[in-house]
């Protein structure tokens, strides 16, 4: 009969002497594998008498458990030694000279920069920033904004509609950031001064239009808000944004369902050699739409048009970015071309402010 004590001493010595994981695995197979020494002993238990089995069984099982424990402990020791060796080999010599940094660094996208510029300008006037979801209800995007049934903007060819829900209602990708104004008027009491930047979506794609574009709208609700206040705000914005000392503006009558009266705003500019300059010249360029908030919109938001009034405006962020920084095509804004971004992008620390300058 096998001497269990001698076998255990021999196996534990082999485990301790295993220099690497492969050698340790060989010891494990020789001891505990299907035909290993300990496994063969366990097979003999079936041929023993009950008395011998009760005496021999615990001894063999104990041997198996101790060998297994020794193998696990040795495996952990080998793993720790391997890790220590790898860390030692990969140690960084901090006395070596550093490598030169990359020639190019990340750039802030022009859209992000222009949004920050707009926020800085209106923030200086006391405006807060309001945001809302890109997916909106038909009620918030159209009905609450005085769009009548059958209006062209409600048609599939102009708006991205989502499949109807179980209750039959359908949601859509907002066509403007005006729903944020509705949410603000329903959740806050006047006086209200907010700007609403964000993504908007329409079926349109060419050199100056994309299916997704960026828009910023402004809203003022108060007891005494007038068109004169609107004109002053827009004039101050244009001077600050285009960084000119003065700018002439003209308001042309227009129509928007959510404002009455409504106007489109042109600013003075010159066009020479393919370059547009603002604050000079005898030409005009349209940049935004505006008007007094329609009484029906105020009612939809729970406000009394006999008690409060207000004005709103909206402009395309992508468009004014193109105008200010001389970008001829809108499509590269969304093409992730690193060369284009290196040319038109901004340094990360060029944070716009009216004190330090919008463009650094």
Swiss-Prot record:
It comes from the Bacteria. It is found in: Cytoplasm. It is an enzyme of class 6 (ligase). Its cofactor is Mg(2+). It catalyses: tRNA(Phe) + L-phenylalanine + ATP = L-phenylalanyl-tRNA(Phe) + AMP + diphosphate + H(+). Binds 2 magnesium ions per tetramer. Keywords: Aminoacyl-tRNA synthetase, ATP-binding, Cytoplasm, Ligase, Magnesium, Metal-binding, Nucleotide-binding, Protein biosynthesis. GO terms for cellular component: cytoplasm. Its EC number is 6.1.1.20. Mg(2+) binds at residue 260. InterPro entries: aa-tRNA-synth_II (IPR006195), aa-tRNA-synth_II/BPL/LPL (IPR045864), Phe-tRNA-synth_IIc_asu (IPR004529), Phe-tRNA_ligase_II_N (IPR004188), Phe_tRNA_ligase_alpha1_bac (IPR022911), Phenylalanyl-tRNA_Synthase (IPR002319), tRNA-bd_arm (IPR010978). The keyword Protein transport does not apply. The keyword Endoplasmic reticulum does not apply. GO terms for molecular function: ATP binding; magnesium ion binding; phenylalanine-tRNA ligase activity; tRNA binding. PANTHER family: PHENYLALANINE--TRNA LIGASE, MITOCHONDRIAL, PHENYLALANYL-TRNA SYNTHETASE. Belongs to the class-II aminoacyl-tRNA synthetase family. Phe-tRNA synthetase alpha subunit type 1 subfamily. Tetramer of two alpha and two beta subunits. This is Phenylalanine--tRNA ligase alpha subunit. It comes from Methylobacterium sp. (strain 4-46).
